[in-house]
């Protein structure tokens, strides 16, 4: 596979730079490898989508995906790595079902954006929940300071979303959490964008379709001592121990999505050189766009406060709705696609996940400069 950060727009005459928040752009080299193997997976005599999930060929694919993720994140044997379906939405329910229901404890939630709000709504169906921090009054433009978080030592767990795609707010590091309390993270939109101290977490999960592969599979990394905490009467698919005990095959897993996820993980390891190098590239790409915003004399106004700007989702507004619509339309003419911001924030959202090539960021930065010059 190629060693560049992703595709060139010249690779196909109709291919654009895709800034979608998810499902999102993927490495072209991975897409081409999948294309080459689509009709007949090596040694199978059939497509990877056609063989049984119990077939040794697919079991090897699953194990390879798991081992590559473990290698990238330095995940120890104290943790289970599971592949599940249902996206982050399922995890909003599964986590409190496993760690809160019947515990006699209270879960602590940190709300820095829309996905945290959705998670706490589901958690309240399973037990007692406290909101430790909520940035709603500022439309979720910042993260808490250390003094804002006073998590009790006896909490069931503390939950946060490491990167809020809609608001473009990201924790630069883990929030303070007592050692006695499992730290739980929705890492869906910044999974594998940088190294992580996995040992600080009780549970970390990510749906793949933003930064790690296609829609249909979620990765759950869970400390094994927490697997037995759940009420045995919770619905079977929600019970993490069922997935751990059955090697992510408690039911038929999303075979194709796991297969592609494994290829993306190997691309990160073999082509990009691992997560430290990927993090450096992500800092460079995001800073290029933030520099345009900061030097625009107020024409572009970033949503997130500067100390928590996202590496993955660059959000900003223009002086008027009319200019925003014009920006989106003209950008599309330059093959810069899917830039419309979420309705709750408005403006522009440029999602520049791992697979967004430097060429795409260069093209967007150049367009932003030219657009501001012509419309200021």
UniProtKB/Swiss-Prot annotation:
Record's keyword annotation contains Protease: no
Any one cellular-component term (Gene Ontology): cytoplasm
Modified residue annotations for N6-(pyridoxal phosphate)lysine: 210
Biological process according to GO: L-serine biosynthetic process; pyridoxine biosynthetic process
Transmembrane region(s): none
The protein's required cofactors: pyridoxal 5'-phosphate
Note accompanying the cofactor annotation: Binds 1 pyridoxal phosphate per subunit.
Keyword set includes RNA-binding: no
InterPro entries: Aminotrans_V_dom, Aminotrans_V_PyrdxlP_BS, Pser_aminoTfrase, PyrdxlP-dep_Trfase, PyrdxlP-dep_Trfase_major, PyrdxlP-dep_Trfase_small
Domain of life, source organism: Bacteria
GO-annotated molecular function: O-phospho-L-serine:2-oxoglutarate aminotransferase activity; pyridoxal phosphate binding
Entry binding sites for pyridoxal 5'-phosphate: 88-89, 115, 165, 186, 209, 251-252
Entry keyword set: Amino-acid biosynthesis, Aminotransferase, Cytoplasm, Pyridoxal phosphate, Pyridoxine biosynthesis, Serine biosynthesis, Transferase
Chief localisation class: cytoplasm
Pathway info: Amino-acid biosynthesis; L-serine biosynthesis; L-serine from 3-phospho-D-glycerate: step 2/3; Cofactor biosynthesis; pyridoxine 5'-phosphate biosynthesis; pyridoxine 5'-phosphate from D-erythrose 4-phosphate: step 3/5
Family membership noted in the UniProt record: Belongs to the class-V pyridoxal-phosphate-dependent aminotransferase family. SerC subfamily.
Subunit structure of this chain's protein: Homodimer.
Function according to Swiss-Prot or TrEMBL: Catalyzes the reversible conversion of 3-phosphohydroxypyruvate to phosphoserine and of 3-hydroxy-2-oxo-4-phosphonooxybutanoate to phosphohydroxythreonine.
Protein name according to UniProt: Phosphoserine aminotransferase
Organism, as annotated: Rhodopirellula baltica (strain DSM 10527 / NCIMB 13988 / SH1)
Gene: serC
